[in-house]
């Protein structure tokens, strides 16, 4: 992450002159060549792309694993995360703030943005009807394929009303999402059908359904309660 940041700022703001008269594209003295030596990576040189008006892109980290949280605390300006409940989201944000304080960063410099999958109708009933229509469009084979890929389980041939089988501990994928889905299935006593319908739309993010006011109230609650920025 530090190496990438160095390359993003290896030109002065006014280095690229693009002067037709002098045929000078950039001022040589405006360069800041990178010579980075880290524990696992060595990188030297510079990129030939000028800085944006903002200086550099926003640094965003996605995920909720232990290494991901620490990386976010050390380097990120925004975190995109999947959290299913208000309490889980609050705990996640507080944990990031604690890690930041431990290394001397101001928690206010990081924005936590949980993913949300809203279905908005004119009324609660209309939103629920829309959800049912979308669920009917999801083929079981597609839903099971998505769910199996996110949990590391082979679900082929299993009854749709069966519970999620035990997920492998050596899953070589998004482990934080695997954990989220396994815990959600246990907490809500979900069948494979319930779970793949949830995954096929929201991909494990927070799903909310209702009228405009109900949706806005729920989003506001997460912000006011300290679950999101």
Name each region found by the language model.
Residues 1-55, 87-91, 97-223:
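An alpha-helical appendage that flanks or caps ligand/catalytic pockets
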Residues 57-62, 77-81, 110-117, 223, ...:
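Hydrophobic faces of well-ordered beta-strands that scaffold small-molecule active sites
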Residues 64-66:
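Short glycine-enriched loops at secondary-structure junctions
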Residues 69-78, 83-85:
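Long, repeat-rich segments with strong aromatic
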Residues 73, 93-94:
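Short amphipathic alpha-helical segments
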